[in-house]
């Protein structure tokens, strides 16, 4: 029976599906059982892990402060508490919402699969984190305390909540105990660290994949909440940092303010010094105008840059103009007040004179003046001015001829000395009528009274008041003019002094080393100076420091020249000496000098640029300022001349050390002291007028009654003694008053200014105190007065010039001036000491504050270290617990993974068994169904598929020879067993191909079943034998464009249609109608072998309808390992006139060729197996003539050995069969095919060809038309 393939495939699919369903159901049952077991184990593990986590996290929860601290301000407290309560309520609501969300999430969760084992742990962790988070938010909102500790006030802290973080700066005055502060700091730091660690751990777990549960829509966003916590903490930390930064900034600002204040003070002091210097200069100018020569030794000013000097000069000028304007205004006001006072005094005097006009003095006594008492009174006044103790106090000043009751009071003004002059000038003498004595009263510290005793006779004439007033007015005008002139002179002198100072700065006094006190060369090699570095081209570097002139430093002028010298020690450089004594060399011209105190120096200080002369001698270059350096660098910039070399013979440096400067200052002070002592020894004592000498004067009669006056001494009196008149007394009193004004009253102002100068200079330069004091001593010493009498013994004459009085004044010295100078010195020292004490107090305060700050910082640092040491143990414990918990968790996870692995292995083994069973079942089914596909039926009406009737391997056989080892071709002609039998089989060649009936039957079904061939002799494999039509069948081939009609006597006609394997012929001729099918039958070709490609090159088998001869030569060469014989089977086909094919079988067989055991069929069609087993080259030829020749050549070489000469093979490469076919005619035409004729005779002398060894490639050449061919390659894989 015929079984359809579709049904078989359908049955196989059903079987496979049923087996799969059975196995799948079994696996599900196993998984459900395992899941029930694992759920219990997992629940237990999760519960244990959750308990462990809660235990660990309980220690890490936020620690609440022990006490709730209060704030001082009640209003702020209430607000903060309300805010905290509101925050708590909000947090509770949030917690409730979170719990609801968690419940919803738990309800919405899908059932847990066996593979999502860690999902349970995730859910547990989420629950735990949410609960912990809700607690932590409440704790944070209520109990987080952020401390803002300032360096100045460490006990001040700020307590704020999350709602009042922005108000942290407002509550700086809240105070909490130190212990509580420490506890709170520790708790806050620990809480911050714990929250950060938790967030880090969560992020790490997310990165590792421990928590992989998908977030639902209702699930709380944990990451955002964690970020909120971080933000809160960061805000607190930022506020702390900001407060600390603010504190530091405030401190820095305070320090800067203090520095600025100090700078301002220094500037003020400098300005005051400049003012005082100006005042001194002005007063000196006044003294010069008054012919009182005062020598002032100015201090050496420190060198300053020109710009600063110019600015200071401008400022000074501006200030001077302002001061002058102020002084003028003050003078005008004073003049007005003085005029009013004068008018008032004149009225009083006029009244008194009218009363006393009746009384006149007749007798006059000599006036005795105690200069010592006057000096005492003046010194008292000066002391009062210097000490400035009597502010707004009245000082009684009386003239030598004043009454006790008539005193004038004037206010104290130290800055304006002209007021005193004007007040004294405005005073008029008043006469005591009773006693005829003029008393001069003054207030002393000792309470001594200074009296001027006078014996004046009364006169009847009274002075004219109008004349006096006019004279006074004229005097005042003269004084004003003098003052104006003095001011102009002062301004001119100031300008001159400024110009002189500028010139002194530009012009240096020091020109050579001889001008220096120390002429030592500090750049000599003898004291240890060295040349440290020079330019590379320099030769004999150390020669410039030597003393000999024959040695020199040599350089080329074109190269850059420079050298660095280390001096013996650090000095104040003043003079530099350079010299070049070599002739026929260029001279250095311009050079620069640089200095530094370190070597190698990062930067050099510019000292100056100098130009030398073109002379062979020593040249000195003086620095503008004295600079203190140890290392000097000299760079030569240019030179004189065009010579090749520029030598330098010597280099010397002159200056002074600090010790030398101090010694010089000490020496100067000592010399000044010696001078002072000499001056003291040469001071004469003052003499009283009229004590030792007597003098007489002649009176100048101004009126009708004139008298003579005499000033008798204590010893002798002149006989011609006459009393002076009133006018003479008045003139004498005026002269005395002028002398007092010029010589005694003005110098104290100078003293004051000098004292102030000393004090200010001592603030700036303490080293120059001695110089200043000594200079002031000289100034003070020259201010004392000595009165000498004329040769006549009388008072000084009025005709004496100011120059003579000034010269006399310089010769006088008083013993009290020495004590005054000493007192001034002591005051200056005390003042300096007080300033030094204040400075030291400031330094002590500054350093004490710094030490306190350092102590505070150190204590904080130590406290931090202690806290860290205490917290390290706790952290170690926490880390150990954390590590233990992690170890436990990992061990549990490892166990779970092991269980998973075991389960997977079990599943794998089950799957293996399943697939083995399936494969075995499929094999069994295939074996069972194989016979259905391979078995053939014996019915004659069996339908066969399309065959290849015109295949080149299709050969006709006419005889039944069972012993033919080659290809047996027979036709119905000769032979008793003549019948047209067409059978196909495989011939076993050397045991490589097996002969089987199945192959034969399959091949017959595929190729040879449609021709109605009958064989009347043999029945082979179900072939019907018909004896009726033997030797009487004639084959007529009619070709009709793609169809083959086979006519036989049995009137068997069959139409063969082309199938899908037939090549479509395109270029067909009218003679050719048969199209070539594929070389292989569809049933004979395995599915792995590719089919010949569809191509246009179709082979035309041309058969002549006129019964032309078809010469088919089948040459088969079988080469065996034994090279002794050659087996050639030549089949020569001759077409007779009777349309019969004569096949001569010449078979030369030897021992190597074994006949098959089964009967050999009469025709052979080569199968694919045969083709693949034998490497082959198949050539199809079509010459396009009336007759075509088809030749198949198969060659096989069994071994790689060289063929012997007896082996003949036919070359099949591109040969045409026209005239090449070898026709071997045998006389014997037996059906057995055994003949011993000329079987090995070949025509055309074809040479033997050696074929290559067996390979897997076969070449297919298709020739068509006029030598057109195409080559196809096909690789066989069988």
From Swiss-Prot:
Q: Give the sugar-modified residues.
A: 47, 56, 166, 293, 356, 370, 386, 391, 405, 558, 669, 832, 941, 969, 983, 994, 999, 1005, 1028, 1036, 1041, 1049, 1107, 1138, 1147, 1214, 1227, 1241, 1267
Q: Could you tell me which residues belong to the region Disordered? A: 58-115, 198-227, 261-430, 436-455, 691-725, 747-815, 935-957, 1020-1046, 1100-1162, 1217-1278
Q: Secretion signal: which residues?
A: 1-25
Sorted alphabetically, the Gene Ontology cellular component annotations on this record are:
cytoplasm; membrane; nuclear membrane; nucleus; vacuole
Location relative to the cell:
Nucleus membrane
- Pfam families, per this entry? Sad1_UNC
Annotated SUN domain residues: 501-658
Polar residues bias locations = 59-70, 363-375, 385-405
* Domain of life the protein comes from: Eukaryota
Q: Which GO terms describe its biological process?
A: culmination involved in sorocarp development; mitotic cytokinesis
Keywords assigned:
Coiled coil, Glycoprotein, Membrane, Nucleus, Signal, Transmembrane, Transmembrane helix
Domain topic, free-text comment: The SUN domain may play a role in nuclear anchoring.
**Name listed for the protein in its UniProt record:** SUN domain-containing protein 2
Organism from which the protein derives: Dictyostelium discoideum (Social amoeba)
């Amino acid at each position: 029976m015929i079984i359809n393939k579709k049904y078989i495939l359908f049955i196989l699919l059903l079987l496979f599906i049923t087996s799969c369903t059975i196995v799948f159901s079994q696996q599900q049952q196993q998984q459900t059982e395992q899941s029930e077991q694992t759920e219990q184990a997992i629940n237990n593990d999760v519960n244990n892990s959750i308990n462990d986590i809660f235990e660990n996290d309980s220690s890490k929860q936020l620690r609440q402060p022990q006490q709730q601290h209060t704030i001082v301000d009640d209003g702020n407290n209430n607000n903060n508490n309300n805010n905290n309560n509101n925050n708590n309520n909000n947090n509770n609501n949030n917690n409730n919402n979170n719990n609801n969300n968690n419940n919803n999430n738990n309800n919405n969760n899908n059932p847990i699969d066996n593979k999502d084992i860690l999902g349970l742990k995730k859910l547990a962790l989420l629950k735990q984190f949410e609960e912990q988070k809700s607690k932590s938010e409440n704790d944070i909102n209520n109990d987080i305390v952020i401390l803002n500790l300032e360096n100045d006030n460490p006990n001040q802290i700020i307590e704020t909540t999350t709602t009042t973080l922005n108000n942290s700066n407002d509550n700086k005055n809240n105070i909490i105990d130190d212990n509580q502060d420490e506890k709170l700091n520790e708790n806050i730091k620990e809480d911050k660290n714990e929250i950060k660690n938790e967030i880090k751990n969560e992020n790490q777990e997310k990165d590792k994949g421990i928590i992989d549960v998908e977030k639902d829509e209702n699930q709380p966003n944990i990451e955002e909440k964690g970020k909120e916590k971080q933000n809160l903490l960061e805000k607190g930390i930022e506020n702390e940092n900001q407060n600390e930064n603010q504190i530091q900034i405030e401190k820095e600002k305070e320090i800067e303010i203090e520095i600025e204040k100090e700078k301002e003070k220094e500037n003020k002091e400098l300005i005051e010094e400049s003012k005082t210097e100006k005042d001194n200069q002005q007063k000196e100018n006044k003294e010069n105008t008054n012919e009182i020569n005062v020598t002032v030794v100015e201090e050496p000013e420190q060198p300053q840059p020109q710009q600063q000097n110019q600015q200071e000069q401008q400022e000074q000028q501006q200030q001077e103009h302002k001061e002058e304007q102020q002084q003028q205004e003050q003078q005008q006001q004073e003049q007005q007040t003085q005029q009013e006072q004068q008018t008032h005094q004149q009225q009083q005097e006029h009244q008194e004179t009218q009363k006393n006009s009746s009384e006149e003095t007749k007798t006059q006594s000599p006036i005795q003046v105690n200069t010592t008492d006057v000096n005492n009174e003046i010194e008292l006044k000066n002391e009062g001015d210097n000490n400035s103790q009597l502010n707004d106090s009245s000082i009684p000043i009386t003239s030598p001829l004043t009454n006790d009751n008539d005193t004038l009071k004037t206010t104290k003004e130290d800055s304006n000395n002209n007021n005193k002059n004007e007040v004294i000038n405005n005073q008029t003498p008043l006469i005591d009528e009773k006693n005829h004595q003029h008393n001069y009263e003054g207030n002393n510290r000792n309470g001594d009274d200074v009296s001027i005793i006078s014996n004046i006779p009364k006169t009847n004439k009274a002075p004219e008041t109008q004349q006096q007033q006019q004279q006074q007015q004229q005097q005042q005008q003269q004084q004003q003019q003098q003052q104006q002139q003095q001011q102009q002179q002062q301004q001119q002198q100031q300008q001159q002094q400024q110009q002189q100072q500028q010139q002194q700065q530009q012009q240096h006094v020091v020109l050579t080393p001889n001008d220096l006190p120390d002429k030592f060369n500090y750049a000599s090699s003898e004291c240890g100076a060295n040349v440290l570095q020079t330019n590379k081209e320099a030769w004999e570097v150390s020669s410039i420091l030597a003393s000999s002139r024959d040695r020199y430093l040599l350089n080329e002028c074109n190269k850059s020249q420079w050298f660095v010298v280390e001096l013996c020690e650090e000095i104040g450089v003043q003079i530099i000496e350079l010299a070049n004594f070599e002739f026929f060399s260029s001279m250095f011209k311009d050079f620069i000098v640089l200095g530094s105190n370190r070597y190698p120096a990062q930067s050099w200080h510019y000292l100056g640029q100098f130009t030398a002369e073109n002379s062979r001698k020593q040249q000195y270059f003086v620095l503008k300022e004295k600079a203190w350096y140890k290392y000097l660098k000299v760079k030569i910039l240019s030179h004189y001349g065009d010579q090749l070399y520029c030598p330098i013979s010597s280099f010397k440096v002159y200056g002074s050390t600090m010790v030398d400067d101090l010694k010089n200052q000490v020496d100067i002070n000592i010399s000044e002291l010696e001078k002072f002592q000499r001056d003291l020894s040469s001071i004469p004592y003052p003499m009283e007028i009229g004590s030792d000498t007597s003098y007489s004067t002649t009176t100048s009669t101004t009126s009708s009654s004139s008298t003579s006056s005499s000033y008798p001494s204590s010893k002798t009196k002149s006989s011609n003694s006459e009393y002076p008149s009133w006018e003479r007394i008045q003139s004498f009193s005026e002269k005395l008053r002028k002398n007092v004004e010029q010589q005694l009253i003005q110098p104290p102002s100078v003293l004051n200014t000098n004292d102030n100068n000393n004090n200010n200079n001592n603030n700036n330069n303490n080293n120059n105190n001695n110089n200043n004091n000594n200079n002031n001593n000289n100034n003070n010493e020259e201010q004392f007065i000595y009165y000498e009498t004329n040769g006549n013994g009388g008072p000084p004459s009025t005709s004496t010039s100011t120059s003579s009085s000034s010269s006399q004044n310089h010769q006088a010295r008083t013993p009290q001036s020495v004590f005054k100078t000493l007192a001034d010195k002591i005051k200056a020292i005390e003042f300096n000491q007080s300033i030094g004490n204040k400075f030291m107090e400031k330094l002590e305060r500054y350093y004490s504050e710094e030490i306190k700050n350092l102590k505070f910082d150190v204590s904080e640092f130590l406290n931090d270290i202690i806290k860290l040491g205490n917290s390290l143990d706790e952290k170690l414990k926490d880390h150990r617990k954390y590590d233990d918990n992690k170890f436990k968790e990992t061990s549990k996870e490892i166990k779970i993974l092991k269980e998973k692995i075991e389960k997977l292995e079990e599943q794998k083994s089950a799957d293996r068994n399943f697939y083995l069973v399936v494969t075995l079942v499929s094999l069994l089914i295939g074996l069972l169904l194989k016979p259905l596909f391979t078995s053939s039926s014996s019915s004659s009406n069996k339908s066969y598929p399309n065959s290849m009737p015109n295949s080149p391997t299709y050969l006709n056989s006419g005889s039944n020879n069972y012993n033919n080892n080659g290809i047996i071709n027979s036709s119905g002609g000769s032979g008793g067993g003549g019948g047209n039998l067409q059978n196909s089989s495989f011939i076993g060649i050397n045991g490589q191909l097996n002969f089987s009936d199945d192959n034969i039957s399959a091949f017959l079904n595929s190729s040879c079943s449609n021709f109605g061939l009958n064989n009347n002799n043999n029945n082979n494999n179900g072939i019907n034998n018909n004896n009726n039509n033997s030797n009487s069948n004639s084959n007529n081939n009619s070709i009709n464009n793609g169809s083959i009609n086979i006519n036989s006597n049995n009137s068997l006609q069959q139409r063969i249609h082309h199938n899908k394997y037939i090549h479509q012929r395109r270029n067909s001729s009218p003679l050719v109608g048969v199209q070539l099918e594929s070389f292989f039958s569809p049933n004979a070709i395995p599915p792995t072998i590719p089919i010949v490609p569809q191509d246009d090159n179709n082979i035309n088998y041309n058969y002549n309808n006129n019964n032309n001869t078809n010469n088919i030569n089948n040459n088969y060469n079988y080469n065996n390992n034994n090279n002794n014989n050659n087996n050639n089977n030549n089949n020569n086909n001759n077409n007779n006139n009777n349309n019969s094919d004569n096949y001569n079988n010449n078979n030369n067989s030897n021992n190597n060729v074994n006949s098959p055991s089964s009967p050999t069929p009469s025709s052979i069609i080569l199968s694919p197996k045969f083709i693949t087993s034998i490497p082959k080259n198949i050539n199809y030829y079509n010459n396009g003539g009336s007759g075509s020749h088809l030749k198949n050549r198969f060659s096989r070489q069994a071994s790689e050995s060289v063929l012997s000469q007896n082996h003949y093979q036919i070359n099949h490469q591109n040969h045409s069969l026209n005239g090449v076919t070898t026709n071997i005619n045998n006389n014997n035409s037996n059906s057995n095919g055994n003949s011993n004729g000329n079987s090995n005779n070949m025509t055309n002398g074809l040479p033997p060809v050696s074929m290559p060894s067996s390979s897997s490639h076969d070449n297919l050449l298709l020739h068509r038309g006029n030598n057109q061919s195409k080559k196809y390659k096909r690789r066989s894989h069988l």
